[in-house]
């Protein structure tokens, strides 16, 4: 395999890209390397003018694998494995106010499942959340930046 980030990075970047966009002001990679020199765990942090995002992925590490989106008036949680989620909750400051969403997704594919998840989350049926060429270019650029920072050939 090529390491945690090259194997799993697109999965963890997609929800952040769809929710916060490409207009980050700073990013930072931190990795733990295995004996073979490849990353076994990588954390990617984005700084946006209005938000922070922390993404983690790992091969050879154990984690719960849930998606947590925190905001000023509440948070959204999709339990593991979040990339296959058919259920998520929106929690508000008032602990008794919890919105629960569930649906059965048709077909396979992470990008379609996340797209449907975001469509439901935002309350519209637009196709704006489908994986676009620009999304793919953004994620490929971040992969390239990671490889350069790791001293690996592109």
Features from the language model and the residues they span:
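Active-site-adjacent helix/loop segment of glycosyltransferases
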Residues: 86, 92
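Soluble or luminal CAZymes and related metallo-dependent hydrolases
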Residues: 8, 109, 135
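Active-site rim elements
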Residues: 2-3, 102, 126-128
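Contiguous beta-strand/loop segments that form the cofactor/metal-binding neighborhood of enzyme cores
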Residues: 12-85, 114-124
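Conserved anion/nucleotide-ligand pocket segment
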Residues: 1-13
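Surface-exposed loop/edge segments in extracytoplasmic proteins
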Residues: 95-100
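C-terminal helix-rich "cap/oligomerization" subdomain common to oxidoreductases
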Residues: 116-154
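Active-site loop of classical SDR/Rossmann-like NAD(P)-dependent oxidoreductases
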Residues: 101-115, 131
């Amino acid at each position: 395999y090529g390491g945690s980030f090259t194997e799993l990075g697109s999965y963890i970047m997609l929800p952040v890209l769809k929710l916060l966009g490409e207009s980050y002001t700073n990013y930072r990679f931190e990795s733990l390397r295995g004996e073979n020199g490849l990353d076994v765990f990588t954390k990617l942090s984005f700084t946006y003018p209005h938000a922070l995002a922390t993404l983690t992925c790992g091969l050879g590490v154990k984690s719960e694998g849930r998606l947590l989106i925190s905001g000023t008036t509440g948070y959204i949680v999709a339990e593991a494995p979040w990339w296959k989620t058919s259920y998520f909750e929106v929690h508000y400051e008032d602990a008794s106010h919890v919105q629960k969403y569930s649906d059965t997704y048709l077909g396979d594919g992470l990008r379609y499942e996340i797209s449907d998840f975001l469509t439901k989350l935002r309350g519209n049926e637009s196709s704006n959340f489908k994986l676009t060429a620009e999304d793919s270019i953004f994620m490929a650029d971040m992969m390239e930046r990671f490889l350069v920072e790791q001293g690996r050939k592109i």
